[in-house]
From Swiss-Prot:
This is 1-(5-phosphoribosyl)-5-[(5-phosphoribosylamino)methylideneamino] imidazole-4-carboxamide isomerase. The lineage of its organism: Bacteria, Pseudomonadati, Chlorobiota, Chlorobiia, Chlorobiales. It comes from Prosthecochloris aestuarii (strain DSM 271 / SK 413). The active site is at D8, D130. It comes from the Bacteria. One of its GO terms (molecular function) is 1-(5-phosphoribosyl)-5-[(5-phosphoribosylamino)methylideneamino]imidazole-4-carboxamide isomerase activity. InterPro entries: Aldolase_TIM, His_biosynth, HisA_bact_arch, Isoase_HisA-like, Isoase_HisA-like_bact, RibuloseP-bd_barrel. The keyword Cytoplasm applies.
Length: 261
């Protein structure tokens, strides 16, 4: 199972939210690029980057910050948050982003998904479904969809979408364990490749998710647990917190473009 570290950007800084609540945010670093380097040096094979400001406003506020991350790293970077037009997707792919995550627009403008898949590879276009009690939430989790999460997935599947990033909002940032049952239910009904997200707290959660590989769950996005050093071998992050700094010399081979999509 591929483990994908998450970097959320708000006001140009690397932050983490609790259950998507913008009033409950913690700033970890002023420069998201430094955070990206840390995760790369800890052997990340891919990064998940979200522009939180764009998720609310629909404007690519942190585009330059994301460009810096992509230009610095030698691994695939997927980007989400406020991507609501064909031009947004072109712009991100144009700077080397490996794949873009369409969230709200999949609900409000499904025709956009069809247009994107007519132009780009399904490996470059994925749909993010962030659900609470089985109901997708959109526009920075401030509005609800009228359909069930798996129903949305099946509609996307008809359009040619191959992968869903599924987030259990009730677990996101809570450090209370992964939403195993909700993810299992969704994956079984959707019948697609699924990247799980939300609530991973320990290696035990990762082991539980591995049992869902038979249903298409082949990767997981991990956020706050990494920032709170809940996993072993996180010496680099510890060193950075202590002011010891980092460098940009990667000790592992480049895997840009080689990640399994």
């Amino acid at each position: 199972m591929l483990i994908i570290p998450a970097i959320d950007i708000k006001d140009g800084k690397c932050v983490r939210l609790t259950r998507g609540d913008f009033d409950q945010q913690k700033i970890y670093l002023d420069n998201p690029r430094d955070m990206a380097i840390i995760w790369r040096k800890q052997n990340a094979k891919m990064l998940h980057v979200v522009d939180l400001d764009a998720a609310l406003t629909g404007t690519m506020v942190n585009f330059e910050k994301i460009r810096e991350i992509v230009a610095t790293l030698d691994i695939p970077v997927q980007v989400g948050g406020g991507i609501r037009s064909f031009e947004d997707v072109e712009r991100y792919l144009g700077i080397g982003v490996s794949r873009v995550v369409i969230g709200s627009a999949a609900v409000t403008n499904p025709q956009l998904i069809a247009e994107l898949l007519a132009t780009f590879s399904p490996s470059q276009i994925v749909v993010g479904i962030d659900a609470e009690n089985g109901i997708p939430k959109i526009k920075g989790w401030t509005e609800s969809s009228s359909m069930q999460d798996y129903e949305l997935a099946l509609e996307m599947k008809k359009l040619g979408v191959k992968r869903i990033i599924y987030t259990d909002i009730s677990r996101d940032g809570m450090m209370q364990g992964v939403g195993y049952e909700s993810t299992r239910r969704f994956a079984m009904k959707a019948g697609m490749r699924v990247t799980a997200s939300g609530g991973v707290t320990s290696s035990d959660d990762l082991k539980k998710l591995q049992t869902l590989e038979q249903y298409g769950v082949d990767s997981v996005i991990v956020g706050k647990a990494l920032y709170e050093s809940n996993f072993p071998c996180q010496q680099l992050w510890y060193n950075y917190e202590k002011g010891m700094g980092i460098d940009c010399n990667f000790t592992t081979a480049s895997v840009r473009g080689k990640c399994c999509f």
